[in-house]
Amino acid sequence: MKPLASLGFAAAFLLAGCSTAEFYWQGITGQIDLLVRAQSIPSVLEKIRDPIVKRKLERVLAIRDYASRELGLPQNASYRRYTEIDRRFVLWNVFATPPLSFEAQQWCFPIAGCVNYRGYFAEKDARAEAARLAAKGDDVYVGGVPAYSTLGYFSDPMLSSFVRYPDTEIARLIFHELAHQLLYAKDDTVFNESYAVSVEEEGLRRWLASQHDLDLDRQFETGERYRATFRALVERTRAKLEKLYASDLSDEVKRAGKAEAFEAMREEYEAAKRAWGGFSAYDYWFAQGPNNASLAAVGLYTQKVPQFQALLAAEGGDLPRFYARVKALASLPKTEREMALAAASGGRSSRASP
């Protein structure tokens, strides 16, 4: 862990920066709270009585060891400590777009550069910021965050906000957040998140193969089926709206078409839920819209995943060589980075959305 004297900088680093003292203060105090209350997982296991959480924490340690041993992810104290929090999410990120565009607003700060979201430790603060942006006419989305990375500045603890997730989802989160610690490109949310998702997906595939557990395999296959349906729905809706927004139609007609597209999206989702037997994990996402901001938020995480997957394949699946290539790309200016990634991945196209 870095000295607490550096905490102000790290808070700016992990949150989507802001010039106000209030914003930085909530980031500093929120991060301190997580760190000072964290306990080593072995010590928690000695006294915990909840058998479900105990088994989950044992699994966390095994996944954490696998991440460094087999995936080449950072070997440090992250996810070897545990913090109990009294809320469903640790952070809430605010996303905003214009009403007829998917161009996500950016917030900038000195250390991490510019990112397409702004994070708060208190939901009420995130909702207040979203209301302020909505009053200006923006589409807004507030996304709950179960875990995040301080990019190696601190030893990120395992949080109660996701300890009860399915084992496959816990593995995803740990692999994803450790991938951020390994490398980070300033001012490029899509690059950073797409890279981390590609590591998460490859890591999960390898971890599952090592477990020889049919229940885990079924858990993964079911989750992937739901995720693929959701992503396809987002992709179809976004493609339809991008075509509409780029047309010569009047803004009034575009707004009407937008409303129709999102209503059709809701109907498709309800039909999908019936086919899933009532699985409702995406209800939170739909409850706030959907709108341009919520679609943009999804796309930020997966837009360039196919390019990173192609780059890994070009390296023969060798993760250390893949990481070296990605680090080299991260060091380039953003425009050059995008061209180099496209070339390095054999011209593989990026996803319009998830």
Question: Where do the PLM segments sit?
Answer:
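Bacterial Sec signal peptide processing site at the extreme N-terminus
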Residues: 17-39
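Bacterial N-terminal signal peptides
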Residues: 6-16
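Acidic/histidine-rich, surface-exposed loop or edge segments in extracytoplasmic proteins
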Residues: 35-49, 107-115, 288-290, 306
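Positively charged n-region of N-terminal signal peptides that target proteins for export
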Residues: 1-4
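Solvent-exposed, acidic/flexible segments
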Residues: 34, 53-60, 119-126, 163-172, ...
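Amphipathic alpha-helical packing elements
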Residues: 31-67
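Pan-zinc metallopeptidase signature
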Residues: 232-354
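Acidic/His-rich structured neighborhood in mature extracellular/periplasmic domains
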Residues: 62-227
